[in-house]
């Protein structure tokens, strides 16, 4: 629920369906709940986590009926009742944004850190759905800001992913907020904010030391968040940060064809000559992906068109193997060696033919590729041509 709604809900003006009930009204509502439950049981179509299958207290909380909730608690209803998903009345009150019920349940001893079957606490629900006023209330009552669900996500992860800046501020101000805590995939709140392009949250996390700038920069590049890249670089992120296989941020962006991101990185000093653990440069990655605009940009910035990876393959090899005819043509225009011998002495023409890319092979032949050069096993590209032509005719 947006933060802008929370003040209206807690201003003393009842929202529809949340008015206090008289004792008579409560009894009438209780009978209605009985009828609804009986109808649901008779239908047999509702699961254990749907309102129709809940007990009276959970249903009353879901509908925001403060008077009925009060009566049920007086009659001995358990404040720790659970639905089929393991959620307590407090979870549901937070989820629905019923601030007055959140207060009431806490006053009646509801466990502020109770976790459902997915490991989510009421504070997780507040970070995802609820008004910021609810989060403040939960935190004042000692809700653990660093609680993790089964996926390893804290409330801060959720709030950051959604760009809920005010909520993030509340969570960062709490004891042990865990801004550097990583989830099951190794992502911090900063990673989630970068993936979603949540600029205000990124600024806030950066000011609080909650962002691992190198890996967050990689996420921003993979997600195509050019504005986030600029912010992170301004905060001191290393422009040539590397991922687990040694690819630089520029390499990641190039492999995905993110030209705008690449421009930002190059303007901030990214080195196009750096390679990953396999010896592949950003140009290798762009060529392999068939990203013509990325290839053109890197070539214009001086990327070496004949650089070889650990298998001896050049960007032209990668383009030919993928059948990326426009990229192949552009690399040739930039002076790429057409008969470069790579792994097993294979040329770009060998790879184009082996992988069934007739048009690319024809382009290479028209530009002077030799059909008679042999691989280490003695194979010539021209020997593959009849088979390739046969495949094309069949298709």
Swiss-Prot record:
It comes from Bos taurus (Bovine). It comes from the Eukaryota. PROSITE patterns: ANK_REP_REGION, ANK_REPEAT. The lineage of its organism: Eukaryota, Metazoa, Chordata, Craniata, Vertebrata. Pfam families: Ank (PF00023), Ank_2 (PF12796). Keywords: ANK repeat, Repeat. Signal peptide: none annotated. This is Ankyrin repeat domain-containing protein 65. ANK repeats lie at residues 52-81, 85-114, 118-147, 151-180, 185-212, 213-241, 245-274, 278-307, 311-340, 344-373. The keyword Repeat applies. Gene3D superfamilies: Ankyrin repeat-containing domain.
């Amino acid at each position: 629920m947006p933060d802008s709604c929370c003040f209206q809900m807690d201003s003393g003006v009842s929202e529809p369906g949340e008015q206090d009930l008289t004792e008579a009204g409560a009894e009438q509502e209780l009978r209605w709940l009985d009828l609804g439950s009986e109808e649901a049981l008779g239908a047999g179509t509702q699961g254990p986590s749907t309102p129709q299958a809940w007990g009276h207290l959970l249903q009353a909380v879901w509908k925001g009926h403060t008077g009925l909730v009060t009566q049920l608690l007086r009659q001995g209803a358990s404040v720790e009742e659970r639905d089929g998903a393991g959620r307590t009345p407090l979870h549901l009150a937070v989820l629905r944004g019923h601030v007055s019920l959140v207060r009431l349940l806490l006053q009646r001893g509801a466990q502020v850190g109770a976790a459902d079957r997915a490991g989510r606490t009421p504070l997780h629900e507040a970070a995802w759905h609820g008004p910021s006023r609810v989060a403040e209330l939960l935190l004042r009552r000692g809700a653990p800001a660093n609680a993790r669900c089964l996926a390893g996500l804290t409330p801060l992860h959720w709030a950051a992913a959604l760009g809920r800046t005010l909520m993030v501020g509340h969570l960062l101000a709490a004891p042990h907020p865990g801004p550097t805590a990583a989830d099951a995939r190794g992502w911090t709140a900063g990673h989630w904010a970068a993936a979603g392009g949540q600029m205000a949250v990124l600024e806030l996390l950066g000011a609080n030391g909650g962002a691992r700038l190198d890996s967050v920069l990689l996420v921003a590049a993979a997600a195509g968040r050019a504005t986030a890249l600029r912010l992170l670089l301004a905060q001191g992120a290393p422009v040539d940060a590397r991922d687990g296989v040694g690819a630089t941020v520029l390499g990641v962006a190039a492999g995905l064809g993110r030209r705008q991101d690449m421009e930002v990185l190059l303007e901030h000093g990214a080195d196009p000559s750096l390679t990953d653990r396999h010896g592949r440069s950003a140009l290798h990655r762009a060529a392999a992906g068939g990203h013509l605009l990325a290839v053109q940009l890197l070539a214009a910035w001086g990327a070496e068109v004949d650089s070889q990876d650990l298998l001896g393959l050049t960007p032209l090899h990668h383009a030919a193997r993928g059948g990326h005819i426009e990229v192949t043509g552009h690399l040739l225009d930039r002076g790429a060696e057409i008969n470069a011998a790579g792994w097993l002495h294979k040329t770009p023409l060998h790879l184009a033919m082996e992988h069934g890319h007739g048009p690319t092979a024809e382009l290479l032949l028209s530009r002077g590729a030799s059909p008679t050069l042999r691989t280490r096993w003695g194979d010539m590209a021209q020997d593959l041509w009849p088979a390739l032509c046969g495949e094309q005719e069949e298709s």
